[in-house]
Amino acid sequence: MSFTAMLFSCSNNTQEVRDFLASKNLPIGIAKNALHVYKDSGRISSKLITPLLHDFSNRKQHPYNEFPMGVKIINFEGKDSVTITGNYAISYSKTSVSEISGNVVVLNHTEQSKLETERLFWDQNTQYFFSEKAFTLSTVKDTVYGIGFECKEDLSMHLAKKTVGNLITSEK
């Protein structure tokens, strides 16, 4: 009877591994069917749901998270509940700007308004959306079509560019 033991040791430190993965443009982490809950002062402020997350936080200059199979974000900030969905997203950590593309839909459940576009940029610091792509903004009263827009996260205070459609307005 013979017995053989082989022992191996790794001497890489965590930073060396991170640098290696970054140099090969590989994520430091991959999560499948991820649910991330964000809390502020013990209160849930938003949820992020995605079938696949690539974590590139190992990048020194521009760390980011990529959602190649789409993303659903439910935001409970303020008085309105807003849901954002898209087929692809990338979120940059340092700037807090996200790009969401492919069948992007933003729903304000409280006001019953909906924004649809193919590409949307979201500045999470200023809580602002903007795009230069074609869009449809539907409210209870009217629907506006156009190319290019800016608006707050809750779809209020919007600036629509190159628009067509009927708008109901009131003087104040």
Language-model segment annotations:
Residues M1-K172:
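Mature-chain termini and adjacent capping regions
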